[in-house]
Curated annotation (Swiss-Prot):
2-[(2R,5Z)-2-carboxy-4-methylthiazol-5(2H)-ylidene]ethyl phosphate binds at residues 134-136, 167, 187-188. Condenses 4-methyl-5-(beta-hydroxyethyl)thiazole monophosphate (THZ-P) and 2-methyl-4-amino-5-hydroxymethyl pyrimidine pyrophosphate (HMP-PP) to form thiamine monophosphate (TMP). Its cofactor is Mg(2+). It catalyses: 2-[(2R,5Z)-2-carboxy-4-methylthiazol-5(2H)-ylidene]ethyl phosphate + 4-amino-2-methyl-5-(diphosphooxymethyl)pyrimidine + 2 H(+) = thiamine phosphate + CO2 + diphosphate; 2-(2-carboxy-4-methylthiazol-5-yl)ethyl phosphate + 4-amino-2-methyl-5-(diphosphooxymethyl)pyrimidine + 2 H(+) = thiamine phosphate + CO2 + diphosphate; 4-methyl-5-(2-phosphooxyethyl)-thiazole + 4-amino-2-methyl-5-(diphosphooxymethyl)pyrimidine + H(+) = thiamine phosphate + diphosphate. Belongs to the thiamine-phosphate synthase family. This is Thiamine-phosphate synthase. Binds 1 Mg(2+) ion per subunit. It is an enzyme of class 2 (transferase). NCBIfam families: thiE (TIGR00693). GO terms for biological process: thiamine biosynthetic process; thiamine diphosphate biosynthetic process.
Amino acid sequence: MTQDFGVYLVTGAEHSAGRSTAEVVEAAIRGGVDIVQLRDKTATARERYEVGTELRTLTRDAGVPLVVNDRLDLAAAIDADGVHLGDDDLPIEVAREQLGSDAIVGRSVSTPDAAREAEQAGADYLGVGAIYGTDSKDTDPEQSNIGLDRIRAVRDATSLPFVGIGGVTPDNAAPVVEAGADGVAVISAITAADDPEHATRRLADAVEGVAPNV
């Protein structure tokens, strides 16, 4: 696929300092975000739908893809561009069958073997981590702080585009791309920033400064 993955925002209302998810996403769009994932583990189904509908309008107007974490039903209901799946979610093949051949289907992995399996199953892209460790998500200790060597190993294992996630900030994003990632995925580096637009722009500058993986 030809989608840019330079700066990938995963929403996190709990980190947004009282701002709405839509406000943060709108600021990130101004800052140059490439793709947005709607993720909210605490909201009700109705709340997720309402936020998703609002984000769908914002992202579509800006030409930025929107994917939904885990929930195929929500992705279909808001006409999202795709879905991002984890270890405990439905298989990639099922997501593809439900959402169609044009849907973007991503998969979280932490090892080269998992990357190969996801590619064989038909994933479009991968999220690899947690690279530096993170407080934004509950991560299995064995999948935390995997480091840049693991990014290099995953790059050797798959031809799929992938983003590195986990503790990424504007100050440490460049080495992730230098190690082989096509971009970086962040939650709090944007959502918790005093100025999400500026934080997004700093991340974009860091990633874009490390061609040719972007």
